[in-house]
Structures are given as structure tokens and as C-alpha cells.
Amino acid sequence: MKKLIFLFLITLSCSTSNNKNEGHANHAISDKNQNSLSPHTVAMAMVGGAHIHIDYSSPSVRNRIIFGGLLAYDEIWQSGAHNATWIETDYDLLVNGNKLKKGRYGFFTIPSRGDWTVIFNKNWEQHGKDEYDQKDDVLRFKVKPIILNDIVESLKYDIDEIDENNGLISLSWEKSKITIPFEIKR
């Protein structure tokens, strides 16, 4: 009888451990129940054991010109609506050849006709870009946007695992997409 109970407990333990990362697969959570034109949304994924979390509000195109229209070129944008978008990691990352220490950061961009500027800022808890200060930038670099054939109606972030040490963060909206490769630093 003891052996039977022991085998049952081992089987239960194994099935539970297989599901432990199930909730951390690349996914987005959106609060569609709220009455907002820009619902609060979250993108999360596990990449090589690191938990990457992006918190943002997701505005929609709604038949507007976004980049170079609603959002002027060459001006700071909180990369979402309402509060500044923030990104959190529980491991140090290597982003664009620079170390980004584990923690939570405000995420901003400067859209442009050419390369966009990507910014990780230590002030993550702010409304929009009102309190943005360049002196609080932890990391700033340029990326080349990808022009999409189809319109992405609602702002969307994705986090993809390339392999156990590398991942990719992407932001897509309207007809533009930027990608930010990163490496997990152990």
C-alpha cells in the first residue's frame, strides 16, 4: 500500500511540474470588459528562464493616420496610450550590445520617417510622456522599422523566444513594426 501511495504522489508531482510554466507562455492579456478605446493590455513570456513582462494600453487605428499624423514624427511617444508603457525583466539582458539590468523600465520610442529611437527609462511609473526626462534614460538606440503590408488595428507587443538565451520583443501598430533582439545574461 505504501508503494502504491508513493507511486501516486510521484505521478501527481510530475504532472504538476510539467504545467508550472504553462502560464508563462508568450501571451497577451487584454481587459476587453473595460469601456476604453485603449484597453489595458499585458504581454508576457518566459525566455530561457527569464520572465519578460510588458504592460501597456493598446490604442486602435480607427481609420486614422498614426505615424506622421496622430503621432508626430521625431517626438517622444510612451509607446502606448495613457500611462507610460513599462517593461520588466527578472534577469539582466543584453540589448543592442548594452547591459540592461534586471528591473522595471519605462519604454519609449521616437518614431521617425527613417530609424526609430528606442528608449528604456528608469522612470517607469508616469502618465504618458509628461514626466519623461532624457537624463533618466538607461538605454537609448536606433532601430529600423519594418513597413507592413496590412494594418495592425490595435497596438500589439509580442515577446518571442528564439532559443534558450535569446529573444525578440516586437511592437506593431498601423503599418509599422519594430523588433528588439535581446540576450539573457546569466
Which role does the model predict for each range below?
Residues 10, 58-60, 91-93:
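Short glycine-rich, polar/acidic loop-and-turn segments at beta strand-coil junctions
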Residues 76-127:
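Mid-length scaffold segments of soluble, non-membrane domains
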Residues 4-12:
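Sec-dependent N-terminal signal peptides
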Residues 15-75, 124-186:
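Primarily secretory-pathway and cell-envelope proteins
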